[in-house]
A protein has these predicted regions:
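Extracytoplasmic cell-surface/polysaccharide-interacting catalytic and binding patches
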Residues: 1-159, 163-164, 174-188
């Protein structure tokens, strides 16, 4: 986006992410490793000047797979223990699977079990619990509704505006504090 800037953090892999997500990303990858899975970061920040950069230009999105994956095939990657662990646990660290399976018509992208996006812990847990994409969450926060065929029935009982975005630099041990009235402000 024009005028969007962020403090960059270069990972050991050479990829860049927004400094604000680094601690949560590190905590997630350390937990993944402790669970016995080896991983490789396959992508991160891409300048908005680069064609096809999309949300990578925010520094909030990155790709990660099992260590020995050569080709990003969703059918293969989604079955790898590393990516299964990441998909099941990423929300605890503030991340979502950005393009989940079965939501292609909503996201406009094929299933990508390696593509993760930071949204904050509260939003990530809410979205994952309620089977929501970022697009569906945005719709709910802005007063719209989503199909119960694509979201769990819990969405009707939960107020998404009660979800608060926390400081993305906070560690997982830190107390979550609201930094904004709108939980999507962190995404802009």
């Amino acid at each position: 986006p024009d005028g969007y800037t962020f403090e960059q953090h270069t990972l050991n892999s050479g990829y860049i992410v927004d400094e604000r997500i680094y601690n949560d990303l590190l905590a997630m990858l350390e937990a993944c490793n402790a669970a016995g899975s080896e991983y490789t970061i396959k992508g991160g920040y891409i300048s908005a000047d680069t064609e096809g950069s999309g949300e990578y230009a925010t520094g909030l999105a990155f790709d990660v797979t099992a260590h020995d994956v050569a080709e990003l095939d969703p059918a293969v990657v989604s079955q790898l223990p590393t990516n299964q662990w990441l998909m099941q646990n990423c929300s605890s660290f503030g991340f979502i699977v950005r393009y989940p399976e079965g939501k292609e018509s909503i996201t406009g992208h094929n299933f990508e079990p390696w593509h993760f996006r930071y949204v904050g812990r509260d939003a990530a847990v809410f979205m994952t619990t309620n089977n929501l994409t970022l697009e569906e969450f945005y719709t709910l926060v802005n007063g719209g509704s989503v199909s119960t065929a694509t979201a769990t029935s819990a969405t009707s009982a939960v107020d998404p505006t009660a979800v608060t975005a926390e400081d993305p630099s906070a560690t997982t041990e830190a107390t979550t504090e609201a930094t904004t009235e709108n939980p999507l402000d962190i995404l802009n």
